[in-house]
Swiss-Prot record:
Compartmental location: Cytoplasm; Nucleus; Microsome; Endoplasmic reticulum
Source organism per UniProt: Mus musculus
Keyword field contains Nucleus: yes
Pfam family, one: TCL1_MTCP1
InterPro entries: TCL1_MTCP1 (IPR004832), TCL1_MTCP1_sf (IPR036672)
Protein name: T-cell leukemia/lymphoma protein 1A
Record keywords, A-Z: Cytoplasm, Endoplasmic reticulum, Microsome, Nucleus
Primary gene name: Tcl1a
Subunit structure as annotated in this protein's UniProt entry: Homodimer. Interacts with AKT1, AKT2 and AKT3 (via PH domain). Interacts with PNPT1; the interaction has no effect on PNPT1 exonuclease activity.
Length: 116
C-alpha cells in the first residue's frame, strides 16, 4: 500500500515591505507578487494576501491608483504588524505556507489600540 507524505504548514518570514505594483498586485522586496482579497464586515477590515506568481504589467503611479481602498505600501513593524503609508497599523493574524501556497491575513487595527 502506498503511503502519502504528510504535509505540514510552514511559518515563513514576513516580507519586510509590500508595495503596490499595479491594481490588485503587490510586490515584496524579492519581487514576489502578492494578490489581495479584501474582507469587510461591520467591525473588521481584513485582507488576505496570497503569494502567487503572475505576469507583471507596467508599474502604476499613485495618481493612477486613486481611489484605492488598500494602502499603497506596508512596512513590517514589531509585534507582528505592518504600518501602512497612511500610518495605520495592520495586525498579522496568520502567515502560513502549505503545499507551496503562501497566505497572510492582515487586520486593520483600531487607531485607539495603536500603541507603539
Amino acid at each position: 500500500m502506498a503511503t502519502q507524505r504528510a504535509h505540514r504548514a510552514e511559518t515563513p518570514a514576513h516580507p519586510n515591505r509590500l508595495w503596490i505594483w499595479e491594481k490588485h498586485v503587490y510586490l515584496d522586496e524579492f519581487r514576489r507578487s502578492w494578490l489581495p482579497v479584501v474582507i469587510k464586515s461591520n467591525e473588521k477590515f481584513q485582507v488576505i494576501l496570497r503569494q502567487e506568481d503572475v505576469t507583471l504589467g507596467e508599474a502604476m503611479s499613485p495618481s493612477q491608483l486613486v481611489p484605492y481602498e488598500l494602502p499603497l505600501m506596508w512596512q513590517l513593524y514589531p509585534k507582528d504588524r505592518y504600518r501602512s503609508c497612511d500610518s495605520m497599523y495592520w495586525q498579522i493574524l496568520y502567515h502560513i505556507k502549505f503545499r507551496d501556497v503562501e497566505d497572510m491575513l492582515l487586520e486593520l487595527i483600531d487607531s485607539e489600540s495603536n500603541d507603539e
